[in-house]
Amino acid sequence: MTSLAAFVGAALMEIGGCFAFWAWLRLGQSPLWLIPGMAALALFAYLLTLVDSPLAGRAYAAYGGIYIASALVWGWAMEGHRPDRWDVAGATICLIGMAVILFGPRPAAL
């Protein structure tokens, strides 16, 4: 699995898992929503371990850009809120930051 696939899968699992809690606490859905929500959050954590990075902190920092962009897509697809130009600009800045973290030149040891 590539790092990008792991990041995207992790984002879907984290957003879906967190949305289960949102649905329960904010939308009045059944607490049974927590069962798939917790499973999704566990899968999210597992998927981040598949990222090609020797450092957890670096993997998590890079993941942040994917998470932000994915959350905006989720809001559009699942909640009907189309991202505005500021959402898109902010996500673009985050994705550029993610690329710097992942692909910036550094010594081979780290």
UniProtKB/Swiss-Prot annotation:
Compartment annotation: Cell inner membrane
Transmembrane feature ranges: 4-24, 31-51, 59-79, 88-108
Bilayer topology term: Multi-pass membrane protein
InterPro entries the UniProt entry points to: UPF0060
GO cellular component, one term: plasma membrane
Keyword terms, alphabetized: Cell inner membrane, Cell membrane, Membrane, Transmembrane, Transmembrane helix
Protein name, per record: UPF0060 membrane protein OCAR_5428/OCA5_c25530
Organism the protein comes from: Afipia carboxidovorans (strain ATCC 49405 / DSM 1227 / KCTC 32145 / OM5) (Oligotropha carboxidovorans)
